[in-house]
Amino acid sequence: MVNFLIFGPPGSGKGTQSVRLAEKFNLLHLSTGDMLRAEIAAGTELGKKMSLIMSKGELVPDEVVIEMIAYKIDNSKGTAGFLFDGFPRTVAQTVSLEKMLNERGMKIDQMLVLEVDHDELVKRLIARAELSGRPDDKDPAVIENRIDVYKEKTEPIINYCNQKGLYQPVNGMGTIDDIFRRLSDHMKKLV
């Protein structure tokens, strides 16, 4: 099984690309945000635990997120591997993910990072706000903060993965199809 991390700042298109890449390479797209919401909506034991934590305004602990991902991996059959979107968010989470994968005879094979010019990110987010009606994508100050937070949080993970030879920057400029081709070219070397 092959496992990819996909990263990119807000507006980089990682969600759009993840869906297409997962389909092309028969990977299970694991979006932790979607998984958290689904567990809570389904009222599972894990969902109840997370709902209680979140209702107090606290972050879901790493071990709970890892438990949720491990459950998904353990119950996924017929997939060539996994595409992690939105996780890990810290070096500690990266280490926990590696440990959990190692226990299953797997590893992180590559960290794909979409690189997009700042002005293009802002343009994409504003355009997305027009379509989605998300007010936070219309406010330039909020956009700037989201991009800054991404850089601050992701840089240590990039450095960690780079030291392990896993970091692969990918040009995220151009059309959706152009970016998809570039990502696919990197991934097909490992799948």
Language-model regions, residue ranges each:
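Glycine-rich phosphate-binding loop of ATP-dependent small-molecule kinases
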Residues: M1-V191
